[in-house]
């Protein structure tokens, strides 16, 4: 009996120590108004955002978060249209096309690089070329671009940003209740930061 009690006490202490690593107002903040029906893990970004580029291509935040997520928990990425003017809106629609066709992984890097690195993306036609170079047929892209599904996905992205009162990117939300706060994490070492970021998402995804 004593051994069982000690084992249970050990589990409680381990849980307490784990929970103590994460503090509301430090690594994350709780939304004043939770969003019902929000994706389990939702990241907002813009191809015009330098920090988003760093998160994706240098730190690989998305990949590390996905690796840590509990089984059955899905991560969703939405593009915002409040950066880049009309081209930013075109990129939001193009991202909706990517989601509809399931080719997000194929176009993320070339879109980021075309906007920020080579600056070869300056029009909707340039965006279309990225998809074609990634192996998507032009007619397939055009059909998706003009489809009801894509229009719905554009509206969905815009509504999601409004629901959480999004003020900037990159930003990640969990269960429609919590927003990650990178400023409250250890940035002295990038590997440690990435690990802490991913671990915090995992912790919050398991919170009810």
UniProtKB/Swiss-Prot annotation:
Keywords assigned by UniProt, alphabetized: Disulfide bond, Periplasm, Redox-active center, Signal
Ranges where the Thioredoxin domain occurs: 20-150
SUPFAM superfamilies (alphabetical): Thioredoxin-like
Signal peptide start-end: 1-19
Major localisation: periplasm
Record function comment: Required for disulfide bond formation in some periplasmic proteins such as PhoA or OmpA. Acts by transferring its disulfide bond to other proteins and is reduced in the process. DsbA is reoxidized by DsbB. It is required for pilus biogenesis.
Protein name in the entry: Thiol:disulfide interchange protein DsbA
Organism: Shigella flexneri
Name of the gene this protein is made from: dsbA
